[in-house]
């Protein structure tokens, strides 16, 4: 089952290469492809489908990847309960959801505080 799930980045990326001409821009097509294909890559190379690591992972895919992990944590799923935002940020920071760029973790934490998703620490 997990092997089937791990195919979705490849399927999504292939779909972005079949957009009708004139519907989108070349740059948007590139970003769409990179996000679809690489949003499950992890900074330490442990992700999929290509095992990219660090800055080999396009920044747009890194951003979507960390936000996707956060969203998965704070929402109920059939296989797990949802976590509070503070716990989700802690889990991401501690690498419990795979490795992310320290800079992106700082950005996510700052955004969460700014939007009052987290309790502000004085």
Descriptions of predicted regions:
Residues 1-122:
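Histidine- and acidic-residue-rich, metal-dependent catalytic cores
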């Amino acid at each position: 089952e997990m092997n089937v799930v791990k195919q979705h980045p490849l399927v999504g990326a292939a779909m972005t290469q079949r957009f009708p001409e004139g519907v989108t821009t070349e740059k948007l097509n590139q970003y769409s492809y990179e996000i679809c294909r690489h949003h499950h890559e992890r900074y330490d190379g442990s992700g999929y489908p290509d095992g990219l690591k660090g800055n080999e992972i396009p920044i747009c895919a890194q951003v979507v990847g960390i936000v996707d992990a956060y969203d998965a944590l704070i929402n109920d799923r059939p296989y797990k309960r949802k976590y509070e935002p503070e716990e989700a940020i802690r889990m991401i920071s501690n690498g419990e959801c795979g490795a992310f760029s320290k800079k992106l973790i700082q950005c996510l934490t700052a955004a969460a505080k700014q939007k009052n998703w987290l309790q502000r620490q004085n």
